[in-house]
């Protein structure tokens, strides 16, 4: 058991007071057997006239804020505490039929997994197909766990991480051609790669805890983090982080899951004005382990 505290602050600045449209937030983590939400606090400045909570089609918690006043600065501050149960040594408890690839999902699972199997991005020349099939053993079945772990580490070791300020994700063929991308680009590449093999995969948005850099000033990547899940019969949805080579949920705080990255944007919204009115956006994410923070305080005392 590990208690992690996440402070996520996003600030928009404008040249003059602008009329703010609705803003959609995905800050509240998903409760599950491996992470339990202890506390959640959301402070928005200026204060909205209404905050409306919903569940989206994937069961994610979404808050929608509506504003009345104009403002030259808009700030969202989310603080959460989660009880995290890390899986340090993933054990693929897959059904016997799924221990080696290729395999097929059974008739009970398939209807619910279809949308997560269907590919969402063009690959006219089969570049993704060709790339992922390099990891299959020639002429014989490939152990499923080994295949997915190898693919995860191949992205981590074979591609260059680049923090991109641009919104959205690169198409997977662009990531393969360029050999670089952000965490969301790598997650999407792995999703499309395993989908090309007929496996169900989905996008995950959340936070990353970096133990080696823990402390009051630790910035958990400076932003939100993204990875993916693959559905394995008997094991369920298993986490794979190709940016860091993480298999399982270790150091990953899950906030939202979706079929496509566009459905799991942490914060989005509009304002009435010209593009020149927007001066910029600043995002700061701080992830701290309470046990480590207490140890640090004790050592300095």
Describe each region flagged by the PLM:
Residues 2, 8, 21-23, 40, ...:
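Structural beta-strand/beta-sheet cores of well-ordered domains, especially the beta-sheet scaffolds
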Residues 97-181, 189, 197, 259-261, ...:
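Secondary-structure boundary elements
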């Amino acid at each position: 058991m590990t208690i992690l505290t996440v402070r996520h602050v996003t600030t928009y600045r404008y040249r003059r007071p602008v009329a703010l449209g609705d803003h959609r937030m995905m800050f509240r983590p998903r409760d599950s057997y491996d992470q339990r939400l202890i506390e959640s606090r959301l402070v928005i400045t200026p204060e909205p006239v209404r905050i409306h909570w919903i569940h989206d089609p994937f069961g994610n918690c979404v808050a929608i804020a509506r504003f009345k006043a104009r403002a030259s600065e808009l700030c969202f501050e989310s603080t959460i505490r989660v009880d995290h149960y890390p899986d340090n040594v993933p054990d693929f408890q897959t059904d016997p039929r799924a221990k080696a690839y290729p395999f097929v999902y059974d008739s009970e699972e398939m209807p619910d997994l279809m949308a997560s199997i269907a590919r969402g991005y063009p690959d006219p020349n089969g570049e993704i197909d060709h790339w992922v099939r390099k990891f299959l053993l020639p002429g014989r079945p490939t152990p499923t766990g080994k295949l997915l772990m190898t693919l995860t580490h191949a992205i981590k070791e074979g591609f260059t991480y680049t923090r991109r300020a641009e919104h959205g994700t690169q198409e997977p063929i662009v990531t393969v051609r360029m050999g670089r991308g952000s965490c969301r680009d790598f997650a999407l590449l792995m999703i499309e790669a395993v989908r090309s093999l007929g496996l169900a995969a989905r996008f995950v948005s959340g936070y990353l805890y970096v133990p080696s850099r823990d402390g009051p000033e630790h910035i958990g990547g400076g932003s939100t983090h993204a990875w993916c899940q693959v559905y394995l019969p008997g094991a369920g949805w298993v986490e794979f982080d190709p940016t860091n080579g993480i298999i399982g949920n270790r150091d990953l705080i899950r906030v939202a899951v979706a079929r496509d990255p566009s459905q799991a944007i942490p914060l989005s919204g509009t304002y009435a004005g010209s593009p020149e009115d927007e001066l910029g956006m600043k995002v700061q994410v701080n992830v701290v382990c309470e046990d480590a923070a207490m140890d640090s305080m004790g050592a300095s005392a």
